[in-house]
Regions:
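Phosphopantetheine-dependent thiolation modules in NRPS/PKS and related acyl-activating systems
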Residues: 2-43, 47-53, 57-101
C-alpha cells in the first residue's frame, strides 16, 4: 500500500495512456477518460493484468489477483478513467481493496 500524492496520480495516468497508446497503436492524444477499453481502443482484460504487474513492480506491492478479480466483479472497468481510478485504489489499498465499497 502506498500513500498517493499528485505526482503518483499523474504517473499512473501517463503509464496507462502510454501503455494503451503503444498496445493499441494510437496516439495518447486520442485516448480520453471516456474511451472504452474494448470498443474504442480494441483492448482486452490481459492488458489490465499487464498494467497491474507494471504497477506492483513500480510500487513494490504484493497483490493477490483473486482479490482484484473479486473487487472488479463488483466494480467493472470499461473506460480508461475507470481503469486509472482502479489502479490508484490498488496502489493505495493493496489487498485491502476488497474491503472498500
Amino acid at each position: 500500500m502506498a500513500k498517493l500524492n499528485d505526482k503518483m496520480k499523474e504517473e499512473v495516468r501517463e503509464v496507462v495512456l502510454d501503455f494503451f497508446a503503444e498496445e493499441c497503436e494510437i496516439d495518447t492524444e486520442e485516448i480520453t477518460d471516456e474511451s472504452n477499453i474494448i470498443s474504442d481502443l480494441g483492448g482486452d482484460s490481459l492488458m489490465f493484468l499487464a498494467l497491474i504487474e507494471i504497477f506492483t513492480k513500480k510500487y513494490g506491492q504484493e497483490i493477490d489477483l483473486k482479490t482484484i478479480g473479486k473487487y472488479s466483479i463488483k466494480h467493472p472497468v470499461e473506460t480508461i478513467g475507470e481503469l486509472i481510478d482502479m489502479q490508484l485504489r490498488i496502489i493505495e489499498h493493496g489487498n485491502n481493496i476488497i474491503n472498500l465499497d
